[in-house]
């Protein structure tokens, strides 16, 4: 696997992430286009072999190309807020093809430090983002993403970073990547490893790998559905409570404190240990183990966005994490980090595709 590390980032790097890099192709399409490819409006699916021609066929609608993929979206927010080129770094795998070059150029344009591993003979991950009647339909081909392996000298690229981030999506390639990043961060004084649960299927399919990973995790992110699955898979709450909704504050708190035990293993090392659950329009719930071993619960309200201004909520979670990590890099409190995450999510949901409109710091 060849290495492409030709961008001109200046640093110093504050945040480093690994993930599945995707080139989003965003276009408005008629219903007949969805029908042609057997897509249901509003769904998010992986492309079947029969659907692979969708990406070339989409050219007739002049799609807009945007960097995509959960972790890449989040570090784009961090880079936007930190401003100085190279402040946020990212690694993943792309194909040796024009889409990979476009993706890299878009990241370079935003000032992001990237080191993409190029997988010969494979195509760059791509997602058709189809807008029809104000709804978004996604059809994704992961391509080279599954080939990613950390290069031996990745720590040189990430030198200086004290915040490390991975999504559970990376477990689909191999758990070794995230485990290596987490282990490295664990050995650096004051470094923090953060993990996103990403999706219910990640929680269910990678139970053992995630349990090992969580022991080296300082901050765990996820939405209420993902945490509900975590609670069920790891028996965090009594069996009769697994069907309860985390829209109920008391149950959300119980799930978060249960998840916190997966991070601490019942011990207090003095290290940062925090679980953060987003709940849509309901307040964010976070459970934190403080330096003296006590557990503190935080509840932070979510600003209201008028319904007519909400265009696309798909990237809200990615934007939240990006805002949170930026604030964390600035030494902000847990509450301030959550508020910054909320502000970034609030901005992103008012646009089609994952784009950032703020010209001044939102937090």
UniProtKB/Swiss-Prot annotation:
GO terms for molecular function: adenosine kinase activity; ATP binding; metal ion binding. InterPro entries: Adenokinase, Carboh/pur_kinase_PfkB_CS, PfkB_dom, Ribokinase-like. GO terms for biological process: AMP salvage; purine nucleobase metabolic process; purine ribonucleoside salvage. Belongs to the carbohydrate kinase PfkB family. Signal peptide: none annotated. Mg(2+) binds at residues 185, 188, 191. The active site is at 318. Binds 1 Mg(2+) ion per subunit. ATP-dependent phosphorylation of adenosine and other related nucleoside analogs to monophosphate derivatives. It is a key purine metabolic enzyme in the opportunistic parasitic protozoan toxoplasma gondii as it cannot synthesize purines de novo. This is Adenosine kinase. It catalyses: adenosine + ATP = AMP + ADP + H(+). It holds the Pfam family PfkB. Keywords: ATP-binding, Kinase, Magnesium, Metal-binding, Nucleotide-binding, Purine salvage, Transferase. Its cofactor is Mg(2+). Gene3D superfamilies: 3.30.1110.10, 3.40.1190.20. Coiled coil: none annotated. It comes from the Eukaryota. The keyword Metal-binding applies. Its EC number is 2.7.1.20. Pathway: Purine metabolism; AMP biosynthesis via salvage pathway; AMP from adenosine: step 1/1. GO terms for cellular component: cytosol; nucleus. The gene is AK.
């Amino acid at each position: 696997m060849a290495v492409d590390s030709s961008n001109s980032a200046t640093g110093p790097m504050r945040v480093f992430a690994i993930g599945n890099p995707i080139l989003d192709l965003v276009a408005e399409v008629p219903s007949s286009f969805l029908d042609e490819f057997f897509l249901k409006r509003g769904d998010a699916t992986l492309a079947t072999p029969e659907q692979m021609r969708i990406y070339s066929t989409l050219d007739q609608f002049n799609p807009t190309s945007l960097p995509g993929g959960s972790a890449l979206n989040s570090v784009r927010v961090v880079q936007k807020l930190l401003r100085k080129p190279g402040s946020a770094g990212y690694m993943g795998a792309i194909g040796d093809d024009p889409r990979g070059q476009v993706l890299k150029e878009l990241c370079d344009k935003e000032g992001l430090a990237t080191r993409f591993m190029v997988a010969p003979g494979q195509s760059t991950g791509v997602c058709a983002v189809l807008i029809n009647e104000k709804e978004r339909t996604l059809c994704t081909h992961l391509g080279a993403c599954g080939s990613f392996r950390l290069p031996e000298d990745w720590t040189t690229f990430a030198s200086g970073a004290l915040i490390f981030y991975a999504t559970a999506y990376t477990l689909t390639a191999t758990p070794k990547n995230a485990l290596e990043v987490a282990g490295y961060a664990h050995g650096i004084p004051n470094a923090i490893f953060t993990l996103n649960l990403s999706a219910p299927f990640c929680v269910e399919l990678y139970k053992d790998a995630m349990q090992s990973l969580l022991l080296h995790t300082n901050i765990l992110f996820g939405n209420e559905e993902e945490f509900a699955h975590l609670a069920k898979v790891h028996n965090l709450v009594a069996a009769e409570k697994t069907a309860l909704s985390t829209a109920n504050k008391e149950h959300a708190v119980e799930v978060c404190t249960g998840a916190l035990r997966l991070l601490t293993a019942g011990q207090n090392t003095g290290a940062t240990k925090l679980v953060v659950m987003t709940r849509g329009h309901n307040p964010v719930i976070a459970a934190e183990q403080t330096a003296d071993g006590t557990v503190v619960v935080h509840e932070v309200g979510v600003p209201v966005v008028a319904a007519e201004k909400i265009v696309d909520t798909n990237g809200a979670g990615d934007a939240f994490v990006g805002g949170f990590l930026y604030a964390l890099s600035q030494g902000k409190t847990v509450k301030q980090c959550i508020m910054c995450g909320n502000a970034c999510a609030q901005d992103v949901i008012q646009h089609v595709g994952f784009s950032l409109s703020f010209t001044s710091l939102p937090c």
